[in-house]
Every structure is written in C-alpha cells, then in structure tokens.
C-alpha cells in the first residue's frame, strides 16, 4: 500500500482534477489512515474501521474521477457500481454482495499481473526456447503433448546436441531476435476450455449464471489442439502459457484476498437514487429502502462468499456519491447514514475552472485532440482567447440547459473540431491555430438558436 502523505496525495490528484480541494483532502486523509492502521499492533488494528465517505455534487464535477485516481495511486483494487443496479433480496436482479465478488475479481487480476511481471524474464526465456524447439524439432521421438517446452522433463530436453544443431539453433535465435522470422507461420499446441453447457441467465442474474457456468466448466477437462499462427503471435501465446506455469494461483488468490480486505475501495455511484423521497411513493420507496437495508451488513462488515474463498468487508473503504438533486442524504435510512460518517460537498464548475481543465491537467482535452490529429500529420494549437471562449460557452450552456459539469467541454470541443477531424487526412502537413473567431464561427448556429443548443450541446 502506498505510504504517500496527505499533501502528496492531493498534489498527485491535482495533476488530473481541478478544484474540489475539500474532497481531495478528505480522501487523502482516509487513504493515509489506512497506512497508519497497518503500522499498529494486530489487536488494535482490527478495531479500527475505515470512515466511509459520501460525496455530494452535480454530475461532471469530479466525484468518480477522484475515487478512481485515488485507487490507481494507491495500487488498490477499485470497483465502481451504480446503486440503482441492485434489487432487494428475493427480487430478480443483482444482490449487493455481487459488488464484493466483482472487487475480488479485480484484485485477482491486479495481483496476477504483478506476479506475471515478476516471472516475465524467465517466461520469455522459456518461451524463446519453446519457439526454437518448434522451429528445430529434435530428432528423438516426442512424447504426447510435447509440442513445446515441458518443464516436467528438463533432463530429456537437455540431451547433448551436436555442434551443428547448436550452431543452427543459435542462428535461428539470432534471426528471431532481429525480427527476421516474424512473418513465418508455425503450429503450436494450445489449451481449449472443455466443452460445457452455456447457461443463459435472466437479466439481473448474471452473477448466478457465471457461477454455474464456471462450476460446469470445471467438470470438463481442458483439451489441446494445434493452431497455426505467425511466430510473433506464437511467442506471445507461449509467454502466457509459461507465465501460467510459473505462477502459483493459490498464492495469487491469497494475496488478492488480503489486498481486497485491507485496501479495497468500493465506489457506490447514484446513491441518491435509492434514497426515499416524498415525491415517489408506494412500492418504489419500499424497494429502495430494501436495497439500503441489504447494503447495511456489507458496509458495516460481513463475510461474502466468492469463488476464491470468503472475503471480509470490515476494512473495505466505501465511497458513495450522488447529485442529491431531488433527495438529501437525510432521506437515506438512519442506519445507512451512520455508516457514512464523512460528507463532503463538491462545488459546481465555473468558467475559470473550465479554463483550467482545458490547460492544466496532464491529460487535458486540448492535449488529447492535438495528439489525435498529429497522427494525421495535422498540427493544431489553441490561443488563450479561444480556450477562454470555450470555457465561457461551457458555463453558459450549463446555466441555460442541464448542468452536466466538465462533460460539457467534450460536446463543445467535438463541435469546434468536427470539420478539422473530418478533413485531417486531406490537410496533412498543415499547422493551424484555433483562435477566438474560429470558436465563435463553429458555435454560431447553436449559440444563436437556444432550442438547437439543447439538442446539439
């Protein structure tokens, strides 16, 4: 787990997210508290639970991005799910425990990727040897299933080759490393999942269908088949196969479970949509309240059964978010409110924020569009006045229509650059400066016709 200080975490988040300093400080403290907890003796460590957070603010102000960047920064398993996808136990739909199973899958993939990186050098060497075995099969008869490197019988594979064979093998090794054999086709043996029965699950019951399919799949052994591919593709397949042999999946599952339990982050979006309000009524409110009650034990701490073993949720950090346009946090049932003790309100964005979003982040929209058009050898640049005009229009359209936050910049930039994107292949080698007049010209029809702007922007 990352041991960055709160100030360093906020500094890293500032590279991608503009403003929202209160929210950044709160999540930075929450992340630092996880590191602090790991430094405590076990008997006290187990008593300290994470302080879950509710983020309130309109769409497009950075709620999801803050949580996503935080998880990436800390190297933690992170899963985002909309609270509206869940249904009360007993109804058709996803149960709330499915998000813990999804988080565990992400943890497995994260740890497996790290373990594969550790054995990468050894796997590449084994894959290269296996490739040369295919290109230069030995004269001795092969055992069944010996289409490539077999670590179970190294003494048989390492019989003393003749000088000519060694020389030829090294020549082929050199040619392979220089890329001279990339277009050549070879036949390799690959594993094929044993034939099972495909279970078609009902909408909302995909988790059950996947578990049944997985269970049936294990009843059928994997089969081997020969496949003809280019050498470069064969090398990638062999690396994957050799890595799988070198990795202990039981150890991966154990490490992943530990990481999920101690450092996992579950992001519950649209939490306001399951809050009961006075406008609706009847069965709708009852159903929403049922989902909230199902969330209680998971957020408080329980044990969820996954195909990799039991996962405790006691120390998973839950971050929930919602616009709360038609509901308030107090509309959540009191028990759930108590399990999210920290609350922070994210502010709406104005033209100054939009300008900073266009210029400051490492992945700013202007940087992205420049890079895209440079692939066609078309160089574009934006004047300061042009970006100020874009920011002003973003604020204006958000005020006059629906406020969708920074996402408004996507629609405006697409409208401004649509002609250049279409003509880019024909304007290879050109350099264009986009100024204020160009922006005004491209947006003229939608700025003058308010009804049209509702549909276009």
From Swiss-Prot:
Example of a GO MF term: ATP hydrolysis activity
Entry annotated with the keyword DNA-binding: no
GO cellular component entries: HslUV protease complex
Span list, region Disordered: 142-171
Keywords: ATP-binding, Chaperone, Cytoplasm, Nucleotide-binding, Stress response
Predominant subcellular localization, coarse grouping: cytoplasm
Residues bound to ATP: 18, 60-65, 269, 335, 407
Protein name: ATP-dependent protease ATPase subunit HslU
Source lineage: Bacteria, Pseudomonadati, Thermodesulfobacteriota, Desulfovibrionia, Desulfovibrionales
Designated gene of the protein: hslU
